[in-house]
């Protein structure tokens, strides 16, 4: 006797088959990778940073989506060992991406935009990494007990080597291009200021503070409002006008963040143009002081424009492979490898090419420069001396105490004597 399936049972059976398929290793991996692709699309195309058109992320976002979708498609066709290894690496990377977005949840203004899909990356990455671990463990059951455990030890050692030297550099590249916006702090400049804004050549609106000059000279202090205000307050106390502003992707300014300072020279060029447009600023008496990434950006801006009449660069180091290859001896090996991967990753995540080498740029600066290397500095900061040697114009070098950007706190009187004296000579002619 034949039976006829009830019509309502067919959708239920289909749903059961779908759930069963998704519950497999391949199904779960594809769900996790799909969440990753969703966040990439959201981050790059649906909800980019303020002032940034989606087309600016086209090829970088396309590469990321293609890699995730390609892995999801090829996943069941890969050998178990390769499948598990890739799942662990990509899963860890997704956790890092999600953790960066989760930082927004600790802010007063809470998450917004692509932070929500970014937060989903944490459980999705954990799921994918867990799948990878289980897959590798199951794939190594053949052979003798000694051989099985030897394989597992070899895999563990391989992970210990490849994670810090392959995966983490790419994770760092993601972090430096997706850093959270710093709060705008309370101004402590020792004088009244104006809230100002200006536009870069690529259409971004930047915001900052301006203290008018009392002695006829003006200095741009960087890394802007989020950075140490002590050098700016020192100059204000000496009568200098000072401009501090949020660079692209930070504070109240438009644009994508980039902790390595790529494209930052455009921000300084816009700041100079703004100062030159003000009737209370003498265009022949504009200087700049930059710390860390700000010091690197000052060197590039000084090389690419004659509008800076004097520049102080403190703590300049490495911002891409183009600087790392100039390290000496054995110190060149690890930084060159790591920064090679960081540079490659940043190029993709920022959809941008690395800026010119600071060695080459330093040789093009024609205006006076004071190079400060506060020892012991961070990795790559020893290149400050090479930047100084490459410079062909009027230059000074101060091997200060205090560590990275710590010269002011370590030697405040000497800092004042050197910085104020440098600007007095080159901006005021005294």
Region spans (language model):
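An N-terminal hydrophobic leader/cap segment in hydrolases
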Residues: 149-199
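Short beta-strand element of the alpha/beta-hydrolase
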Residues: 216-224
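Conserved alpha/beta-hydrolase
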Residues: 232-254
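Alpha/beta-hydrolase active-site loop
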Residues: 258-279
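Hydrolase active-site cap/lid region
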Residues: 300-351, 361, 382, 386, ...
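Short beta-strand/loop motif that positions the catalytic acidic residue
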Residues: 364-366, 371-373
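Conserved alpha/beta-hydrolase "acid-adjacent" motif
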Residues: 377-384, 407
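Catalytic histidine-centered segment of alpha/beta-hydrolase-like enzymes
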Residues: 403-416
């Amino acid at each position: 006797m034949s039976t006829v399936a009830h019509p309502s049972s067919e959708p239920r059976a289909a749903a059961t088959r779908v759930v069963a398929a998704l519950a497999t290793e391949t199904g779960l991996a594809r769900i996790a990778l799909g969440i990753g692709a969703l966040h990439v699309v959201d981050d790059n195309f649906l909800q980019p940073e303020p002032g940034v058109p989606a087309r600016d992320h086209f090829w970088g976002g396309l590469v990321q989506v293609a890699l995730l979708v390609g892995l999801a498609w090829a996943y069941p066709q890969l050998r178990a060992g390769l499948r598990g290894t890739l799942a662990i690496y990509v899963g860890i990377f997704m956790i890092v991406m999600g953790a960066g977005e989760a930082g927004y949840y600790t802010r007063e203004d809470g998450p917004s935009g692509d932070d929500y899909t970014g937060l989903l990356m944490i459980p999705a990455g954990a799921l994918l990494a867990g799948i990878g671990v289980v897959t590798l463990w199951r794939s190594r059951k053949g052979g003798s007990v000694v051989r099985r455990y030897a394989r597992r030890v070899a895999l563990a050692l391989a992970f210990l080597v490849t994670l810090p030297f392959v995966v983490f550099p790419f994770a760092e590249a993601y972090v430096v291009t997706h850093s959270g916006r710093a709060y705008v702090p309370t101004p402590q400049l020792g004088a009244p200021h104006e809230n100002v804004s200006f536009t870069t050549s690529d259409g971004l609106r930047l915001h900052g503070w301006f203290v008018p000059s009392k002695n006829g000279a003006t200095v741009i202090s960087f890394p802007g409002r989020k950075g140490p205000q002590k050098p700016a307050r020192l100059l204000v106390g000496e009568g200098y006008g000072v401009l501090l502003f949020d660079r692209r992707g930070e504070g109240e300014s438009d644009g994508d963040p980039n902790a390595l300072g790529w494209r930052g020279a455009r921000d300084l060029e816009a700041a100079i143009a703004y100062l030159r447009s003000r009737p209370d600023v003498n265009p022949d008496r504009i200087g700049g002081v930059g710390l860390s990434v700000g010091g690197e950006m000052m060197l590039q801006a000084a090389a690419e424009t004659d509008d800076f009449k004097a520049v102080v660069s403190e703590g300049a180091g490495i911002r891409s492979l183009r600087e790392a290859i100039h390290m000496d001896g054995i110190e060149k090996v690890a930084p060159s490898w790591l920064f090679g991967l960081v540079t490659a990753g940043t190029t993709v995540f920022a959809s941008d090419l690395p800026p010119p080498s600071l060695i080459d740029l330093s040789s093009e600066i024609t205006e006076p420069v004071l190079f400060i290397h506060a020892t012991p500095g961070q990795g790559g900061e020893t290149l400050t001396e090479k930047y100084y040697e490459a410079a062909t114009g009027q230059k000074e070098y101060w091997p200060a105490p205090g560590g990275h950007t710590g010269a002011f706190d370590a030697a405040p009187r000497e800092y004042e004597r050197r910085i104020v004296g440098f600007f007095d000579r080159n901006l005021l002619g005294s």
